[in-house]
């Protein structure tokens, strides 16, 4: 029998339909009738017949014709909205749809699985789980560990042992023993009371990451959750039913209690949930629409679901992956700028970096050589100024290996900490099945990821700081020898004048965001939890800084490509021409002023999707396989015996040099 979930005046109603030949109008009237039946005053209506309404899908908000047959117009379990005409309690939008969160009109249920064991999840895996590319299953070893852990909890309950969080209250109430008949109520109360976050909800991608990471940590078998409950949580994830999780409210110890409580609240059928099928609705209806039942918590299971650093760490995973992507592409963008400004490649000589062998510095210098080596990739632009009188470039060009390099090393350091945290048990108390006991500790404290993500923000910010200075050099005619602000008919046109201001504003804002949040701490829970990490803010502001970096580099990418226009018909190296072609596939050259924000967004999207890296990476890797490490690429300003031999009829003897 088909069934539909209908929203009427803020209420969600499940309406079964025995006959698919019934109409959309019948569904609307039946929903209104059920709404009136549940209200003492019939909702203010005298009869269903007097109610005039429209019906539309929650997904996409498409209006339906009241005469259409249900079996034709709707799918089983679809969510619809009844909009009552002229009714102030029935606005022309869905009240439960939070700002900034939209339905996935193109969502496709994944077919592939990732097997979680609590020990081997990577940052890349978690980001892909967040994007909905995979479903989850447990390894057989993980299932066994979870079962063994639960047996310890069951034994504690049976023997009526006093153990924190299982038979006692929480925090300041740790010495309050709870009667056996109240242990399940204790867990539900915990989830409800701790669901006290504020702010906008996490996006579906971030909520999916949060849920997947909590599943991975529970799969380690140190939290005492039952295998039955954990499998229910996995079913919810695989159906993409996602709780309403406000982004603010965690102090990062004892774990991320508020956001994880909101996550658990939806699992027990309370609060709001979202799915691609339903949009936002009451959690119990979203679960029912996917054939799922609310989880009934057993003793310890509420605590098992909410105690840990998964909010900090899941956002940290996204930050690390996005930082890695933009750091790689920053080298390509800077190389293009160097070409436009007719810089020298001599600063990327292998010997310079061999005597200061930081891993990131060496790799960045190599990438510049692979993109700019005029022996490997002839450049007409480089040849045009081979014998100019320049000796060396400004720091923003010459010192890219040193500045970009430390960013790469910072990301690697942070990624190592975040990866360890991904696969760590962060509950309290911990259940050690091999010892048959629980131990209270402090693994829930978020200081590790908090400090790491503060460091990440500081490190990655420098990519934007140096990029903004390169944008200045591109736009300033006294430095670039190009038209002011990269546009013809300056004065009539302003070109990149304010795009550069935008970059400067983003860099300035990020400087404030780079103030480390983990240096702060406030005592909470009546001084029981008297030192906290503030890691939630560290993670959120790291993501904001990284977004600013992406946007600044998007502006530099556009500016560099526009600079190329004024050097035509000369060509740059083959890999950089491919980058130019990529940008021109989404943004045309500026002949005169036009609305610039969409172009910045288009370039930002190329960087987010790693398209710039995709077109350049094959050339970088080919160069890696073919180049001779000791070789030194000829530069427009290189001065060496070899260059003299190639370019001069008279070569001085070595004794005369």
From Swiss-Prot:
Pfam (any one): Lyase_aromatic
GO cellular component, one term: cytoplasm
CDD domains assigned to the protein according to its UniProt record, in alphabetical order: PAL-HAL
Keyword hit for Lyase: yes
Outcome recorded upon mutating residue 533 to A: 16% of activity
List of residues that carry Phosphothreonine: 396, 637
Listed EC numbers: 4.3.1.3
Record note on what altering residue 508 to A does: 75% of activity
Posttranslational modification: Contains an active site 4-methylidene-imidazol-5-one (MIO), which is formed autocatalytically by cyclization and dehydration of residues Ala-Ser-Gly.
Domain of life of the native organism: Eukaryota
Ligase found in the keyword field: no
SUPFAM superfamilies, sorted: L-aspartase-like (SSF48557)
Pathway(s) annotated for this protein in UniProt: Amino-acid degradation; L-histidine degradation into L-glutamate; N-formimidoyl-L-glutamate from L-histidine: step 1/3
Cross-link (5-imidazolinone (Ala-Gly)): 253-255
GO-annotated biological processes: L-histidine catabolic process; L-histidine catabolic process to glutamate and formamide; L-histidine catabolic process to glutamate and formate; L-histidine metabolic process
Family to which this protein belongs: Belongs to the PAL/histidase family.
NCBIfam families tied to this protein: hutH, PRK09367.1
Protein name: Histidine ammonia-lyase
Record organism: Rattus norvegicus (Rat)
């Amino acid at each position: 029998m088909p069934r539909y979930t209908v929203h009427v005046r803020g209420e969600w109603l499940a309406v079964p339909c025995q006959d698919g030949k019934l109409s959309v109008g019948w569904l609307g009237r039946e929903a209104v009738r059920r709404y009136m039946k549940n209200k003492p005053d019939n909702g203010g209506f005298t009869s269903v017949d007097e109610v005039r309404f429209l019906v539309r899908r929650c997904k996409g908000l498409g209006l339906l014709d009241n005469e259409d047959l249900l079996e034709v117009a709707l799918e089983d379990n679809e969510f619809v909205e009844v909009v009552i005409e002229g009714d102030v309690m029935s606005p022309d939008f869905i009240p439960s749809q939070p700002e900034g969160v939209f339905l996935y009109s193109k969502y496709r249920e994944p077919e592939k699985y990732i097997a979680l064991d609590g020990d081997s999840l990577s940052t890349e895996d978690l980001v892909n789980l967040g994007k909905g590319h995979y479903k989850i299953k447990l390894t057989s070893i993980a299932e066994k560990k979870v079962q063994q852990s639960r047996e310890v909890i069951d034994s504690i309950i049976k023997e009526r042992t006093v153990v924190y969080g299982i038979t006692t209250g929480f925090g300041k109430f740790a010495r309050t023993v709870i009667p056996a008949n109240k242990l399940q109520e204790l867990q539900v109360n915990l989830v409800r009371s701790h669901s006290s976050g504020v702010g906008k909800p996490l996006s579906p991608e971030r909520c999916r990451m949060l849920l997947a990471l909590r599943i991975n940590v529970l799969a380690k078998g140190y939290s005492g959750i039952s295998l039955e409950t954990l499998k229910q949580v996995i079913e919810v994830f695989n159906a993409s039913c996602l709780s309403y999780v406000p982004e603010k409210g965690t102090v990062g110890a004892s774990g991320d209690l508020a956001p994880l409580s909101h996550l658990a609240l939806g699992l027990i059928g309370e609060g709001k949930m979202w799915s691609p099928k339903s949009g936002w609705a009451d959690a119990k209806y979203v679960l029912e629409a996917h054939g799922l039942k609310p989880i009934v918590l057993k003793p310890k299971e509420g605590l098992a679901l909410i105690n840990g650093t998964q909010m900090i760490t899941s956002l940290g995973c996204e930050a690390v992956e996005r930082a890695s992507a933009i750091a790689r592409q920053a080298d390509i963008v800077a190389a293009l700028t160097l070409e436009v400004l007719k810089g020298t490649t001599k600063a990327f000589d292998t010997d310079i970096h061999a005597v200061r062998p930081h891993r990131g510095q060496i790799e960045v210098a190599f990438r510049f050589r692979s993109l700019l080596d005029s022996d490997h990739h002839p450049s007409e632009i480089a040849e045009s100024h081979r014998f100019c009188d320049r000796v060396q470039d400004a720091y923003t060009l010459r010192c890219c290996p040193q500045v970009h390099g430390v960013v790469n090393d910072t990301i690697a350091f942070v990624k190592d900490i975040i990866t360890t945290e991904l696969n760590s048990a962060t509950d309290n108390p911990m259940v050690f099945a091999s010892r048959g006991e629980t131990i209270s500790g402090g693994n829930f404290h978020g200081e590790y990821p908090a400090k790491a993500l503060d460091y990440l923000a500081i490190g990655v910010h420098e990519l934007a700081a140096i990029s903004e200075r390169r944008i200045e050099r591109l736009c300033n005619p006294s430095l670039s020898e190009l038209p002011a602000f990269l546009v013809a008919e300056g004065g009539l046109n302003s070109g990149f004048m304010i795009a550069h201001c935008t970059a400067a504003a983003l860099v300035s804002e990020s400087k404030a965001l780079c103030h480390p949040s983990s240096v702060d701490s406030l005592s909470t829970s009546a001084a029981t939890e008297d030192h906290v990490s503030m890691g939630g803010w560290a993670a959120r502001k790291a993501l904001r800084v990284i977004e600013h970096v992406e946007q600044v580099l998007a502006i530099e990418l556009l500016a560099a490509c526009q600079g190329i226009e004024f050097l035509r018909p000369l060509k740059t190296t083959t890999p950089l021409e491919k980058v130019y072609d990529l940008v021109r596939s989404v943004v045309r050259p500026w002949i005169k002023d036009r609305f610039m924000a969409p172009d910045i967004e288009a370039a930002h999207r190329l960087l987010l999707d790693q398209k710039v890296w995709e077109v350049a990476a094959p050339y970088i890797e080919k160069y890696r396989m073919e180049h001779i490490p000791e070789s030194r690429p000829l530069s427009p300003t290189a001065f060496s015996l070899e260059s003299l031999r190639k370019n001069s009829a008279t070569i001085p003897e070595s004794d005369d040099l």
